[in-house]
Structures are given as C-alpha cells and as structure tokens.
C-alpha cells in the first residue's frame, strides 16, 4: 500500500499546521512548546473545513511534538459538528505517555460515530486511514483484511 502522500496545500496556524495530503488526508501538526487553546482549535477546524471544501476527509493528528492542549480545545475537537460530520476516520500519532492519556481521554469524550485509533508510527496510521476509507466505500480486498489484523489492538 502506498504510504507517501504529497502535500497539496499547507496552512500555517498560530500554533500548528494543517496539511492537505493526497488521498483526502488532513494532517494536523502542532508547533512545539505552545498551549493549544480553544481559539486555536476553532481556527484549526475552520482551516480544515476550508481545505477539504466541506467534503469527507481522513484526519491524521501528529501529536508527537506539542506543548499541551487545553481542556476547552480537547472538548471542542471532540464535539464540534463543523468537521465531525465529514470526518471518515481519525488516527492520532503519539510518542509519550501524557500524549497517549490525552488521546484516550479525547476518544472517550468524542464518542465518535467514526473510527478513531492511536498509533506510535505515522506510516501505520496512514495505512490504517487508507483501510478505513476503503471500508467505507466498499473497496476492501482480501489482502487489506489480512493487513487489518495488525491493527486490532492499540
């Protein structure tokens, strides 16, 4: 499966970056050592919606580099309907225990109708997102099902 996605568009935010990648993937990356507040989450969601032009997308959150995220921002990301309704699936990439705890809390808070999964490897996260998109649109092949076994547990 192809895991390299060229950047189609990059939007710089005050405390992060939104990258539109091929394959309907939106990558949210945080800038180092900042506190991602509610206003930053609102700005990010508006930028995401604008980048995808209101069409379904796959969300890839790279939380390997970040300062912290406020409770208001976490709750906003979990419950805001602007992008939640068009998000096919979401993969969160982490590399620290605090980030894993934040991600697990976010998953419980969001009660998403769409799949959300935590990863430590960004390539695995992209492959999983690709599989979720194929599942949604009925394009899953037998080799994809074997591949899916790798991701049954977090």
Predicted regions and their residues:
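Amphipathic, Lys/Arg-enriched alpha-helical "gate/interface" segment within cytosolic domains
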Residues: 1-154
């Amino acid at each position: 499966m192809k895991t390299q996605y060229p950047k189609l568009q990059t939007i710089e935010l005050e405390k992060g970056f939104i990258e539109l990648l091929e394959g309907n993937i939106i990558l949210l990356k945080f800038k180092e050592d900042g506190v991602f507040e509610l206003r930053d989450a609102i700005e990010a969601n508006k930028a995401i919606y604008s980048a995808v032009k209101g069409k379904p997308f796959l969300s890839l959150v790279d939380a390997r580099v970040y300062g912290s995220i406020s409770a208001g921002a976490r709750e906003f990301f979990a419950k805001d309907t602007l992008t939640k309704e068009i998000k096919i699936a979401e993969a969160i990439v982490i590399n620290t225990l605090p980030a894993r705890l934040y991600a697990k809390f976010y998953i419980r808070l969001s009660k998403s109708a769409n799949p959300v999964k935590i990863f430590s490897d960004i390539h695995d996260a992209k492959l999983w997102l690709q599989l979720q998109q194929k599942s949604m649109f009925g394009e899953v092949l037998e080799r994809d099902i074997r591949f899916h076994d790798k991701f049954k547990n977090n």
